[in-house]
Design a protein with these regions (language model features):
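Positively charged n-region of N-terminal signal peptides that target proteins for export
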Residues: 1-8
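C-terminal motif of bacterial Sec signal peptides marking the signal peptidase cleavage site
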Residues: 14-18
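Bacterial signal peptide processing site
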Residues: 20-23
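Extracytoplasmic/secreted envelope proteins and their assembly/folding machinery
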Residues: 32-35, 56, 82, 93, ...
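Short, compositionally biased low-complexity segments enriched in polar/charged residues
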Residues: 48-80, 91-96, 124-125
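Second-shell loop/turn segments in exported
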Residues: 81-89, 135-140
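Short Gly/Thr-rich strand-loop-strand
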Residues: 90-132
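A short, solvent-exposed beta-edge/loop patch
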Residues: 119-157
């Protein structure tokens, strides 16, 4: 009888585990919370200023308007910046990620040719571009350890 109880319990556990379904979608980043944490992390050497919301799509080359966005750019003519975008869905976020990657590539190519701020070239080459759910994050900074601590340390929703 004891063996039968153990066997039935094991079968019930296997059946319940099979009903688990798909893993949840990755949580996105909250633009306000994440941008504040990044700005306070010490990751940036240059003074940053928030970009007007109506300029975000044109600045980053986005096809679709984000539902929410926080974008900061360098006031010093440098390339340090951060952007956290909330898009309508994961497909729109994937398209936004592609546009953001193209934005970083264009800036890298420009700096390689012009050498206006050569000290920023390594920052551009190490830029962080991530998609989490329906959000996209871009960070061009001086301290990527600080960036990683924020993005990997629980600032996601």
């Amino acid at each position: 009888m004891k063996k039968l109880t153990v066997l039935l319990t094991a079968l019930a556990l296997v059946a319940l585990a099979a009903c688990g379904g798909k893993a949840p979608a990755p949580a996105g980043y909250d633009p306000e919370t994440t941008s504040k944490a990044l700005l306070e992390s010490g990751a940036f050497e240059q003074e940053l200023s928030q970009l007007d919301a109506d300029m975000v799509s044109a600045y980053l080359g986005l096809e679709d308007e984000p539902e929410a966005a926080v974008v900061y750019t360098s006031l010093e003519g440098g390339y340090e910046e951060l952007a956290i975008l909330t898009m309508a869905d994961e497909d729109a976020a994937a398209a936004a990620k592609t546009a953001v990657e193209a934005h970083v590539t264009a800036q890298t190519e420009t700096e390689t040719e012009v050498q206006y701020k050569p000290e920023d070239l390594p920052k551009l080459k190490d830029a962080v571009v991530r998609q989490a759910g329906n959000t996209v994050v871009l960070v061009v900074a001086a301290d990527y350890d600080a960036v990683g601590a924020v993005l990997d340390g629980g600032s996601a929703e």
